[in-house]
């Protein structure tokens, strides 16, 4: 498979963006404070903002969005006898998510301002997680990817186990079992692909793996394992059950990291490994991804509609929206796959905003039950306005990023001639059910929170105050790109369209190979008693 040669970095921007927050985290225990965590808060905010600026500088100084291949490429021999190298780079698949990660993390630090219990440990974990998540998107070596993938598991586990709600131990244990257990498939697939040629030193680099002529059976086996691993993180129904429990116990900044970044790791990995490195298997598995996407959309939307717990309602809404990512990845059109990429960025912003507002509302009401929240709109008018704007973004209101990303997925899939017309019509019709349900459950949620039957005991609470400047600032920072992308999507799509076009072209070649092989088998085989070469019958 021909792919462009990587372009070497003039300056180690990506290594710096990974190592800077990790080194910053290691300094946290030595920061003097008076027990209130004021100093460490400001320190973490400065480190996260500098990391964000480093990624922005990397984009403007060393990244050309018109090029398909890897840029900002760095490769340093690490353990040569084992085939391990420090290899990082960015293309259109990774650069938008690197920027999203550093942006969301800096806002999550600001959202964590009220944290007073073990603040040093909390901000240490946020900074370490920042570097680990950037590494997931930037590394260009499959074993390094596995290490980065595992690195972000432990901060999330501790966030849930230490700062979570009443069922925090259950949620944390379930999270680590699901995610760490499924990660074994990444390691096994990576080792199998790296040692594929046999003999000599293995090579786990993406560029090397993309050029290997893996057999179709080998691809199908690796694809199956990776689909399970990445399906847990996306998540794909029925591998999703850890997510509502995790969101149900997490605090607001952890919500932002989970919804804004963690879920996108699964979508990115499906594009990077399943679609790019295993194209023949992807051509055969793609219809399954489409079906799973439809199941995600409908099942999660119906479940969200039935939820009375605010966190779980938004969690299932996230699962539903990620179904569009699956449909886009399963399509063989640049428009549909581009829509999946945009949906990941869009949902990262929208999901982070909604979950932050859930946390802010809980801090005031101390309840997550919609039945107990009625009538708080008269005391929290600005909060209601923020909720309304973010809910409209989530229900894909025209002029916001969610609308254009879902529209691209729909149009890209419906016009994709790889699939038969009846299949496209059925999938589009079923997916439309989720689009219809989303405004119903989100608008009814707003009504129940702010304009339902008044809870006199809740209304009388002195702490039922309106949004404060810090909260308004965080939501404003998220709404600006949501609206900006919605009004002018090219500002985002131009960053990755070249890489998406190249990916789709290679996958279409795989589709043609499979069709050609099937046609050859159909024409050359005939019924034969006592042999395994029986004909393939229509």
From Swiss-Prot:
Compartments in which it is found: Cellular thylakoid membrane
BP terms from Gene Ontology: ATP synthesis coupled electron transport; electron transport coupled proton transport
Principal localisation: membrane
Annotated EC: 7.1.1.-
GO molecular function: NADH dehydrogenase (ubiquinone) activity; ubiquinone binding
The gene coding this protein: ndhD
GO CC annotation: plasma membrane-derived thylakoid membrane
InterPro entries in the record: NADH_Q_OxRdtase_chain4, NADH_Q_OxRdtase_chainM/4, NADH_UbQ_OxRdtase, ND/Mrp_TM
Membrane topology: Multi-pass membrane protein
Catalysed reaction, written as an equation: a plastoquinone + NADH + (n+1) H(+)(in) = a plastoquinol + NAD(+) + n H(+)(out); a plastoquinone + NADPH + (n+1) H(+)(in) = a plastoquinol + NADP(+) + n H(+)(out)
Taxonomy, superkingdom: Bacteria
Keywords for this protein: Membrane, NAD, NADP, Plastoquinone, Quinone, Thylakoid, Translocase, Transmembrane, Transmembrane helix
Record's function text: NDH-1 shuttles electrons from NAD(P)H, via FMN and iron-sulfur (Fe-S) centers, to quinones in the respiratory chain. The immediate electron acceptor for the enzyme in this species is believed to be plastoquinone. Couples the redox reaction to proton translocation (for every two electrons transferred, four hydrogen ions are translocated across the cytoplasmic membrane), and thus conserves the redox energy in a proton gradient.
Ranges annotated as spanning the membrane: 11-31, 43-63, 95-115, 119-139, 143-163, 175-195, 217-237, 251-271, 285-305, 314-334, 340-360, 382-404, 425-445, 472-492
Protein name: NAD(P)H-quinone oxidoreductase chain 4
Family statement drawn from the similarity comment of this UniProt entry: Belongs to the complex I subunit 4 family.
Enzyme class: translocase
